[in-house]
Design a protein with these regions (language model features):
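Transmembrane beta-strands of outer-membrane beta-barrel pores
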Residues: 1-5, 38-42, 80, 89-93, ...
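Residues that define the transmembrane beta-barrel architecture of outer-membrane proteins
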Residues: 16-20, 68-72, 95-99, 136-142, ...
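A C-terminal functional module that forms or caps the active site or interfaces directly
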Residues: 191, 198, 206-240, 246-250
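Detector for outer-membrane/organellar transmembrane beta-barrel domains
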Residues: 79-84, 102-217
Length: 285
């Protein structure tokens, strides 16, 4: 129903997130929700070549999860007509302890205009067998977005900062608001900034244009600096009637460039990416 801290899959990729285990929900009051989840098996974007796998300890030498360790989640969310404040945490023996907060506030400007602010905070600490003497064992991220909504669409600005990058097979830190198909926002000491506009041609058809810049480092050694810039363009069409009602078509193209002086990948990297997804939304009651 909304973005539940740590439990909700946040990847912008065409792959879904799948959890196998048990999920619990309790509406403590009309304004307070409690969520709990125990997960034994999972499928994330990092598992695209292997499929659904056991939760556990990642072995970087073999690329497999050698030891099975279930992961437990707990989250709470308070909301009213214009706000939602959520906090969640997870515990996984020999892997990590994580905490995430999501704050959302909408301010009506007049009957047709609103201003919405969103702020995400995240902290993770590796535990037990996942700790590494040569790499950072903890990280923090802060990211936010401000959106001005109008009858014709919206204008938004977003930013994010990641202290330390981590292997996505262990801890997913690619969760900030700035979005690019090409440029990496998930690197050491990485800042990312984006401005964009969504223009609604019809109630069903929307165009998006959003340039982005990034600044960070290639690794925890901080010996190769990354300076990136890119432009994202997209279109979205939602079927509102007929037998395909609820189907959503999304097409995006992205052009980016990075300066990485001294990198083994090259001093100048050029990217061109295209993404298309067809999604059908429905609800079982």
């Amino acid at each position: 129903p909304y973005r539940i801290p740590l439990m909700a899959g946040s990847s912008q990729r065409t792959l879904p997130t799948v959890s196998e285990g048990a999920l619990g929900y309790w509406a403590l009051t009309p304004n307070i929700d409690l969520w709990g989840m125990w997960r034994s098996r999972v499928f994330l974007w990092t598992d695209s070549t292997t499929g659904i796998r056991d939760e556990g300890v990642y072995n970087s030498q073999t690329g497999k999860y050698d030891k099975h360790r279930a992961r437990s989640f707990l989250a709470a969310s308070w909301h009213d007509d214009t706000s939602r404040y959520s906090l969640g945490g997870s515990v996984q023996k020999d892997v990590s302890n994580q905490i995430q907060s999501i704050l959302e506030k909408s301010i009506p400007l007049d009957p047709n205009y609103t201003l919405k602010g969103e702020l995400l905070g995240f902290y993770a600490q590796l535990e037990g067998l996942s700790r590494n003497t040569s790499q950072p064992n903890e990280t923090a991220l802060v990211s936010g977005q401000l959106t001005w909504n109008a009858p014709w669409g919206s204008v938004f600005g977003s930013g994010g900062y990641l202290r330390h990058a981590m292997n996505g097979a262990v801890v997913d830190t690619d969760i900030g608001y700035p979005f690019s198909l090409s440029l990496d926002r998930n690197r050491e000491g990485m800042q990312s900034w984006q401005l964009g506009v969504n223009y609604r041609l019809t109630p069903q058809f929307t165009l998006t244009f959003a340039p982005i810049v990034t600044r960070g480092y290639e690794s925890s050694k901080r010996d190769v600096r990354i300076e990136g810039a890119g432009i994202l363009g997209g279109m979205n069409y939602r079927v509102s009637e007929g037998p395909l009602q609820g189907m959503n078509f999304f097409l995006a193209a992205d052009k980016g460039r990075e300066k990485r002086d001294g990198s083994a990948l090259g001093d100048r990297l050029n990217y061109w990416d295209v993404k298309m997804s067809i999604q059908y939304d429905f609800m079982l009651k």
